[in-house]
Each structure stands twice: as C-alpha cells, then as structure tokens.
C-alpha cells in the first residue's frame, strides 16, 4: 500500500519535534455543487525543529509515533517570509 501524502501550511510549531499542519481539502457539495473547503489539522514529526509557522510543507504517513502523531514532514516546499526575516 502506498504511503499517503498531503501538502499544507504549518500553523503551530510550539511543541518539541512536532508541528501542526493545516491541509485544505476542496470538493463540490454532493447536492448543491458549490465548492466547499474543509481544513484538517495534522500533527507531524519534525526531527530537527527546522520548520516554522507559515512554511508550506509536504507530509507523509508513518507508523504511529505518539497518541496523535502519524505523519512526518517529508520536505519544505517554501519558507514563509516572516521566518526568513527572523533568521537574519
């Protein structure tokens, strides 16, 4: 079985080695056909604490790492402008 992947935005990085990633899912409503967006929040493992709030990341499914954590950050697609300014 292939591992699932999601792309989302980091909304919290306050935990040690864990980030919260918000993934937006858009789909047409079954009856009214209006596009509906649902946001799901995943806790993902970040081994080096390198990801900051606002970063766009790709997460992949892993074995259960804790009670709520079943995803890991695979790669950082883009850094947020605020995170880049904080480094300087």
Curated annotation (Swiss-Prot):
One of its GO terms (cellular component) is cytosolic small ribosomal subunit. Disulfide bonds: none annotated. GO terms for molecular function: rRNA binding; structural constituent of ribosome. It comes from the Bacteria. Pfam families: Ribosomal_S17 (PF00366). Keywords: Ribonucleoprotein, Ribosomal protein, RNA-binding, rRNA-binding. The keyword Cell wall biogenesis/degradation does not apply. One of its GO terms (biological process) is translation. PROSITE patterns: RIBOSOMAL_S17. Part of the 30S ribosomal subunit. Belongs to the universal ribosomal protein uS17 family. One of the primary rRNA binding proteins, it binds specifically to the 5'-end of 16S ribosomal RNA. This is Small ribosomal subunit protein uS17.
